[in-house]
């Protein structure tokens, strides 16, 4: 193990456990507050180490790197607080043993988002800085909703920063805002279930759980623990927003009619503040349920009466779904969630709808690469779990040749069966768990073929597709068996699609 340190201090230490993006941000923030640090990582040369060492050259920091499969027994000596990286699985070695020791010693374990929440509380006291905070979590769609919400807020005339799981880390964004003297009026936070596990005092003005499907069970242990981690963000929120199509998110609130609850879904909204979709005369619309123009004053509540609930209202059509540049029903639902978050700030519809119309989406998320011979090639490499792929297949509205496979993370692939049967012309399988997906899909009768690499996958898919179809890369799996990460997988797919176009004489 590699151990180095700068000047020692006798004060209790903060242990930064894991030097990913959030660990680096937490280390910078704690050093900025004058805390002596001990930084530990299983890797000898974690990414960003040199930059961190340069940034903390004048701070009191002890580095414990290259810990490997076991953290040293004295790692907790003198430690008052552990800042745990979301990349470390708490029930696996060596993290499990260290956290057990921390509990025995009454050492507090927090995450970077908890430090961010405490930082905002401190700034409220020292600078009277009280921004609005919006929080987004869910299995799929978090980044799209976070990025879109920020744009809608800025279109409405308020300054906003997006941070958290979307990158940059929340504390890195806060440090930057402080250094530039440019603190925003609104923070829009994308929060993963990992981050929520170690967050206790964040109290958003509004929070949304977009959906909950199987993912990260290797980290949480089971589906119940995963859903509970997502639900943590709703209880302290002033306004809770849920997907009424998803029973797991609906169960996170006491009642969909509650005054502090809003919902979105595929159906027409019935309660004031809710949003949904309406199909009228062959056109799908984004809709909102708004108060009637001449509502009577609410009657005085009698003693022991049940709590007041939201009333019904009138439906307003906002814009046709086809006017969105982002593709698929799942992205229409993402747009509804983003608008509800922005509306919680009392922003008007006009600027939001103009921005929504122009929003082109985030990379590797149902992203149109190009069309070749009347076949659309769509990069949904961020579809790293079954739920994301189901949403992509259901949302596109056309027959699909699906490219799927990779590292399955122990998921149940059976939810793919009905949507593949309905929407897929064929499936091209890649990666270590491609064969496992193929076996699950056998009852569909949909042709499944294997490909050794992305080049072969794209060309096999092109052969199977018919005019009007889409070739969809939505793997339902992690990428690390064949690629550096999901962006790399998407980039390779896009490059192979462009090569295919050149081979077929299509340049534009």
Swiss-Prot record:
GO process terms (BP): cell division; cell wall organization; peptidoglycan biosynthetic process; regulation of cell shape
Residues in coiled coil: none
GO molecular function, one term: UDP-N-acetylmuramoylalanine-D-glutamate ligase activity
Functional pathway: Cell wall biogenesis; peptidoglycan biosynthesis
Compartments, record wording: Cytoplasm
GO cellular component, one term: cytoplasm
Claim: GTP-binding is one of the keywords in the record: no
Region: Disordered, residue numbers: 294-314
Catalytic activity, reaction form: UDP-N-acetyl-alpha-D-muramoyl-L-alanine + D-glutamate + ATP = UDP-N-acetyl-alpha-D-muramoyl-L-alanyl-D-glutamate + ADP + phosphate + H(+)
Predominant cellular place of this UniProt entry's protein: cytoplasm
Superkingdom of origin: Bacteria
EC number per UniProt: 6.3.2.9
Protein residues bound to ATP: 138-144
Keyword vocabulary terms for this entry: ATP-binding, Cell cycle, Cell division, Cell shape, Cell wall biogenesis/degradation, Cytoplasm, Ligase, Nucleotide-binding, Peptidoglycan synthesis
The UniProt record lists the keyword Translocase: no
One Pfam family matching this protein: MurD-like_N
Primary role: Cell wall formation. Catalyzes the addition of glutamate to the nucleotide precursor UDP-N-acetylmuramoyl-L-alanine (UMA).
HAMAP family referenced in this protein's UniProt entry, alphabetically: MurD
Similarity comment: Belongs to the MurCDEF family.
Protein's name in the database: UDP-N-acetylmuramoylalanine--D-glutamate ligase
Lineage, broadest ranks: Bacteria, Pseudomonadati, Pseudomonadota, Betaproteobacteria, Burkholderiales
